[in-house]
Amino acid sequence: MRIGLFAVGRLKAGPEKDLAVRYLDRFAKTGPAVGLELARVAEMVESRAANAETRKREEAVQLEKALVDGSLLVLLDERGKALDSEAFANLLATFRDSGKRDLMIAIGGADGLDPALHARADAVLCLGKMTWPHQLVRILIAEQLYRAVTILSGHPYHRA
């Protein structure tokens, strides 16, 4: 299964980007052994519309353009379902085994994600009940993707 990340906002050069890239590289190297591969990271500039609803809608249009036809969609949202690392790994395995070829994980902008995306999503997850800066969400999901692969492959990185 090809997994892509979609993010509203660009990750500027610096330690946050370096760490996210490090975990995505690890995922890209180890994922194929368990049938998961990194397809791409798609970034878009945040909408500059006057109100939040319009910004969310404009950002949703960009996300829809980035989606491959028939792909699964997972949204990261502070009101989503919290999973531990093993449950996240199992969710990825379930998606992989579903016969779908593509999965997109979406990180919304400062205003969140459009309700139409929530209605279309295959899962809405949170990385805890706290609100996280965009840069840290990228690092956290990159690390969790790598951790999921190590869980699925039996690698000792994850020691629960």
Curated annotation (Swiss-Prot):
Pfam entry (one): SPOUT_MTase
Positions in coiled-coil regions: none
Enzyme class, first EC level, given as a word: transferase
Gene3D superfamilies named among the record's database cross-references: 3.40.1280.10
One function term, GO molecular function aspect: rRNA (pseudouridine-N3-)-methyltransferase activity
Top-level lineage group: Bacteria
EC number(s) on file: 2.1.1.177
Protein's recorded name: Ribosomal RNA large subunit methyltransferase H
Upper classification of the organism: Bacteria, Pseudomonadati, Pseudomonadota, Alphaproteobacteria, Hyphomicrobiales
